[in-house]
UniProtKB/Swiss-Prot annotation:
Family to which the UniProt record says this protein belongs: Belongs to the eIF-3 subunit H family.
Subunit-level organization: Component of the eukaryotic translation initiation factor 3 (eIF-3) complex. The eIF-3 complex interacts with pix. Interacts with mxt.
One MF annotation (Gene Ontology) recorded for this entry: translation initiation factor activity
Organism: Drosophila willistoni (Fruit fly)
Protein name in the entry: Eukaryotic translation initiation factor 3 subunit H
Lineage of source species: Eukaryota, Metazoa, Ecdysozoa, Arthropoda, Hexapoda
Principal place of residence: cytoplasm
Keywords: Cytoplasm, Initiation factor, Protein biosynthesis
Key word Transmembrane present: no
Coiled-coil ranges from the UniProt annotation: none
Source species, domain of life: Eukaryota
InterPro entries tied to this protein: eIF3h, eIF3h_C, JAMM/MPN+_dom, JAMM_MPN+_peptidase_M67A, MPN
GO annotation, cellular component aspect: eukaryotic 43S preinitiation complex; eukaryotic 48S preinitiation complex; eukaryotic translation initiation factor 3 complex
Length: 337
């Protein structure tokens, strides 16, 4: 995945290094174009973000796509360095400040996303990941969000410990893996003038389909994804419950063996014989490896995201239904008159 970095000097993570992200309209259009092109092929679009940091504001001024992973002859790191070197020659911002990727059905949180952002954020302190939801944007809602790993998530990855105890000690949950950074889009005055002129050229019957009710496929996709994630979380819960049962059984057998050894040692002591150390019994019971809970945490976050999207979608659809009903009643009343 996108575990590439333009700078390799490792820096210490500081909290609230970036207050908000400012993205140029040109960079947004290039990201949108790339993500929609790849979505037609059911591929995940990824690319690099270029810009600079000014007073805790990350300004994204340009971007370029990563080569497709299927091309084995392509040296991805050399490709990025070559692109940034050529941008520098034409006096374009060439500092690597993060990466972007597409998302479908709001399902952006994944293990690959966490790993990639960890590599970026530990090598480029101010880096962010920008996620573009192609499906939601295609319905007329520009969905562009910027995220950074929280200090707790960074520390957890550095320790490499994903056990339940580590999650509890660091107070890490699916809601605290990423911190969303506010993102604003800035256009030049000339761009704003052009947008105003294009808006006047738009036909009146275009761009106003706000009461479109043909959105059953959106809810269906969200529900299907939600069911799949719930099933995955159930399988994770079954595996963890089996681990707990094995640990409980092992502890019971160990306590029984230690109690038996204590009784035997008491008899040996009364006979003046040497006792057997408890270490001999403990060695027979090897500790069970604790299963990692990172996958279950990510799956829980995906379930929460789908549930929020379904709730938002249903509330919007209900509002459309009530508005449409009122308009239909008004139309029928007018026809009767």
């Amino acid at each position: 995945m996108a575990n590439r970095g333009g700078r390799h000097a490792r820096t210490e993570e500081t909290e609230n290094a970036i207050n908000y992200v400012q993205c140029d309209g040109l960079a947004v259009m290039k990201m949108v174009k790339h993500c929609h092109e790849e979505s037609n092929n059911m591929d995940l679009a990824q690319g690099a973000l270029l810009g600079l940091v000014v007073d805790k504001c990350l300004e994204i001024t340009n971007c370029f796509p990563f080569p497709k992973s299927g091309d084995e002859t392509m040296d991805e790191e050399m490709y990025q360095l070559t692109v940034m070197r050529r941008l520098r020659r034409v006096n374009v911002d060439h500092l690597h400040v993060g990466w972007y990727q597409s998302s479908d059905v709001g399902n952006s949180l994944s293990l690959a996303l966490l790993e990639s952002q960890y590599h970026y954020q530990t090598s480029i302190e101010e880096s962010v990941v920008v996620v573009y939801d192609t499906q939601k944007s295609s319905r007329g809602f520009l969905c562009l969000k910027a995220y950074r790993l929280t200090p707790q998530a960074i520390q957890m990855y550095k320790d490499g410990d994903f056990t339940p105890e580590a999650f509890r000690n660091l107070k890490v949950g699916y809601e605290s893996l990423f911190a969303e950074i506010p993102i604003v889009i800035k256009n030049s005055p000339l761009t704003n003038i052009m947008m105003s002129e294009l808006n006047e050229l738009l036909p009146e019957d275009k761009g106003h389909n706000f009461l479109d009710l043909g959105t059953a496929s959106v809810l269906e996709n969200h529900m299907r994804s939600l069911i799949e994630r719930v099933d995955e979380l159930y399988q994770e819960a079954v595996r963890y419950n089996k681990y707990q049962q094995v640990v409980f059984k092992q502890d019971t057998e160990k306590h029984r063996a230690l109690a038996k050894l204590a009784a035997e040692n008491a008899v040996r002591t009364s006979k003046g014989e040497p006792t057997v150390s408890e270490e001999e019994v403990i060695k027979q019971f090897r500790p069970m490896p604790v299963p990692a809970r990172l996958t279950a945490t990510i799956t829980s976050g995906q379930i929460n995201t789908h549930a929020q999207h379904i709730a938002q979608f249903c509330s919007q659809s209900l509002a459309k239904l009530f508005i449409t009903e009122s308009l239909q009643n008004a139309k029928e009343a007018k026809e009767i008159k």
